[in-house]
Amino acid sequence: MPIRVPDELPAVNFLREENVFVMTTSRASGQEIRPLKVLILNLMPKKIETENQFLRLLSNSPLQVDIQLLRIDSRESRNTPAEHLNNFYCNFEDIQDQNFDGLIVTGAPLGLVEFNDVAYWPQIKQVLEWSKDHVTSTLFVCWAVQAALNILYGIPKQTRTDKLSGVYEHHILHPHALLTRGFDDSFLAPHSRYADFPAALIRDYTDLEILAETEEGDAYLFASKDKRIAFVTGHPEYDAQTLAQEFFRDVEAGLDPDVPYNYFPHNDPQNTPRASWRSHGNLLFTNWLNYYVYQITPYDLRHMNPTLD
């Protein structure tokens, strides 16, 4: 699926070097087809890096995807140039009267922060409430899963004693589930979080269907039966080097982090890691776009909410 982005977005050249099909707005305007409108609420500090990761995964299908980047934190960013944010991101007020086929809410490094202490917690709640009437399907990633479970289901914050970091094995629970179509019975995915997601908690306090979990009973992928919301507790979008960058950052900060599990060859941080989760990550996003967005979204987005012109 060619992703449709502004001509000047840095990701255009970055992804083209990887032979990823990126369609600029100027070229897309010549195609008579309604693109899927996907809104990305980017909560990660290094926004350009995160853009590249998610856009890569949204690029593999024959339809256009029109990407809109959203920010809700008005504080000055220490990791992303203000010019980039001003040129490529919108505020909630800019899109609150629009409808979207899909919404992706990224993770955020807030695992040890109480929800009410998050600077933009009221804005998160506002976006999630808004999405019920304005978005066909929403995909929550890592910390956003924890936030959504609290806002939508009232589940208290669950925090691990030690950070979960590494590449872990998961198994699918329903072989014919659409979101895991094409997955191997067992697959690998990276995690980097303090948030805890016991599968038993999800089963006991929600009506969500768990689609994949670990042997230890940690939920990895779950969704609502109507396909309106889906949750992935890991980071399938991560590059091969992302966990290494986080590890060495924490080492330099004097935090004495554990070496990420099942990641560095021979468990030696001096060895170059290889991504073992790319195929599953691509399948997950392709399946979400196809079965949870494209297959159920109205052709005319105004029909999602008849009060909108």
Curated annotation (Swiss-Prot):
Site (Important for acyl-CoA specificity): 111
Organism domain of life: Bacteria
SUPFAM superfamilies to which the protein is assigned, alphabetical: Class I glutamine amidotransferase-like
Assigned keywords, A-Z: Acyltransferase, Amino-acid biosynthesis, Cytoplasm, Methionine biosynthesis, Transferase
Top-tier EC class: transferase
GO cellular component: cytoplasm
EC number: 2.3.1.46
Reaction(s) catalysed (UniProt annotation): L-homoserine + succinyl-CoA = O-succinyl-L-homoserine + CoA
Name of the protein described by the UniProt record: Homoserine O-succinyltransferase
Native source species: Escherichia coli (strain ATCC 8739 / DSM 1576 / NBRC 3972 / NCIMB 8545 / WDCM 00012 / Crooks)
Sequence similarity: Belongs to the MetA family.
Phylogenetic classification of the source organism: Bacteria, Pseudomonadati, Pseudomonadota, Gammaproteobacteria, Enterobacterales
Binding residues annotated for substrate, in chain numbering: 163, 192, 249
Role this protein plays: Transfers a succinyl group from succinyl-CoA to L-homoserine, forming succinyl-L-homoserine.
Gene Ontology molecular-function annotations: homoserine O-acetyltransferase activity; homoserine O-succinyltransferase activity
HAMAP family (alphabetical): MetA_acyltransf
